[in-house]
Amino acid sequence: MSFLDRSFELHFNERPYLNHFSYLFITKTTRERSRSRSNFSILCRGNIIPKEVRDKDAVSRFLESVDQFERILNDSVFIRLERLTTDEIVGTPQQAGLIEKYFSLSQQDTTTLKDIQMSASEMRIGDDILCVHTLSDVDDLPGSVQTDTRYEKYSTDRSDCRLSFAAPVGLMLSCDHIYNQFLFIDDSAEILQRFEKTARNMHSLSKYSCANQLNKQWIDAYLDEAHSFGLTAIRCHCNVMAWSDSREKLKVIKNDTGSALALMGCKPRYNTIDAPALYWAGIPGGEGDFPSEESFFTFVEQGVCFFTEETNYADSLSPFGIKMADRTNGKPLHLDISDEPMRRGITTNRNKLVIGPSGSGKSFFMNHLVRQYWEQNTHIILIDIGNSYKGLCDLIHQRKNGEDGIYYTYSEKHPIAFNPFFTEDKVFDLEKKESIKTLIMSLWKRDTEVITRAEEVALSMAVNLFLEKIKEDNELVPSFNTFYEFVQGEFRGILEEKHYREKDFDLTNFLNVLAPYYRGGEYDYLLNSDEQLDLLNKRFVVFEIDEIKEHKILFPVVTVIIMEAFINKMRRLHGVRKMIVVEEAWKAIAREGMADYIKFLYKTVRKYFGEAVVVTQELDDIVSSPIIKDTIINNADCKILLDQRKYINKFDSVQSLLGLTDKEKGQILSINQANDPARKYKEVWIGLGGVQSAVYATETSVEEYLTYTTEETEKLEVTQMTEKLGGNMEQAIRVLAKEKKKKK
């Protein structure tokens, strides 16, 4: 585990969060049992097994129905059921089962036996005091219910963030609790017949009381609804069981639970009398013992509205991924946005498009992503403008004792320099030869000049002969200088032997045009680097091109070398993950006629276990280049958006261009709307193939923050402390992080 990985783990160590488990129990009961009241519970009787349970045909029909129900839900793709085994329900000597966990109010695999105490005023399980709120009467319910509702904290005037109707009593209720939802499927026809009989009785008694007439009207409305739309009549009950071992905390929990029910439009009802019976009926498989007087009549459609549909963010079931955090409770997450989505058929490639305005945390997120990819043995080439990756690259360079973390940048004192003719193994495959020819061609001919077939053949011959000489002559130092001298001397003689005419290949013109790159020329440093550096085996390489992006000579050369370096990795590193990240520099690359290369890259890199990532501030930049627009958007199945509030009024065009759904739009516009002030983080939306999307928190340790930061003052702090500690950047980050933690 690396220093930064360890600091991430320690940052989240022992952080409390609300965990969520969901169980669906389908219980077979009898007509008599379903009508029984709380005073007829099995707690009060000796014989607990009804005779219908011993009817093999009835049991067989029930199990067939359950199998069919399971198959229907699993086939829907949206939800998946996993059937519990007998050991998982009743437990084993080594591991607690679900029933044991229920009786101890714990999800731990090892549980302790706890006394259950019941009195008229409260119910205790061990040290915990139970607090039960119920929805068991129609009078306590709102006038209407719905499957989902608008969550104001994450909504804007232009977007909705939708949560399930019962979300306030699910994960939004931040205390230990169980939310039970009971749906009793009785004989619907029999229920409706009973209601019709009751309505007639009410009509007969209406002259004695207006209330009877009013009740008849309500019953008639229920019957009309059932018959008009063919609805199934059912009974329903919901309750929230919360607990605490402290009476003071229990008061707060009681108020919080009541407030959560009020948010649903329900009247909070605190239940003490029936708490034991409700707790008993909540035992897995014990729902048949539910007291019927605690239920109300409704229809299936309205009953399922009381289900909670949210759960904790799940870790990816993959060994590869990045570490993010749950936006609501700060739980650390393992997230795979490259391999797992492809395995599951959600995406068809690993390419990514990252969009975030200045100040949205775009560079910070990208630092976090590439650092973790690098630590998982990914080869990464970054093309940057603005020194966003300088801190991370320096740290890697120091950790690897200069063997990795290569940072190319241009300054007057230290101009950028390469050696395209050097490889550690002296292997020059077809791609390498073609890239050298392309490089020399770009130096020799302008874009407007046409190269003839004869010139192309001569240049190809010169390159191939020189590369052969490098392999044979161990004394020869490969560089542009020695190539120039080879062409000037040996190759001139070869051309004369082959009777090349000047009009076919003007050697003098060739040498004159390339003279500025030869020893003593204006750009003699560019292709004659003294560093024997082969980028093929360097896993983290940054090209910072801010100073040369407008340079007509240097920029095209650097661009060709960058592309050659990545293609070389693509072709030669088999079974190794490759990533190229093009920050704002892609605009300059496209302008220099490299749009076709990006197009090729996005369509081809998938076949070589690679991924291309383009990072931009505004979508308009991409739209302005038709080739880029069609290629990047259509071939980047992973789209990553940061805070878009600056563009909220024109987000419809972004939605249309990226093909986002209204749900995805709502998620994106909810970014950073209700961040927890106790945590330092920014949110990011990740969408995969138009199928799966969520908002995550980019929350890091102080050590990671100091490594990634692009704030000038903070970068300066790290630099000064590094110098003070004799150049040890890792130690400098540790010292500064310790100081900042003390100030909190």
Model-predicted regions and their roles:
Residues 1-304, 308-309:
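Extended, folded cores of ATP/NTP-driven motor/assembly subunits in large transport
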Residues 262, 374, 606:
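Anion (oxyanion) recognition and catalysis
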Residues 22-25, 379, 539, 578:
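The start of beta-strands in P-loop NTPase/AAA+ ATPase cores
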Residues 13-18, 228-233, 325-327, 343-346, ...:
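Short glycine/proline-enriched loop/turn "hinge" motifs that connect secondary-structure elements
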Residues 338-360, 364-371, 380-392, 406-414, ...:
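Conserved P-loop NTPase motor cores
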Residues 9-13, 427-481, 626-744:
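P-loop NTPase motor core of the ASCE superfamily
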Residues 170, 277-333, 339, 390, ...:
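P-loop NTPase motor domains
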Residues 28-30, 244-246, 324-328, 337-339, ...:
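Short, flexible loop/turn elements at secondary-structure junctions
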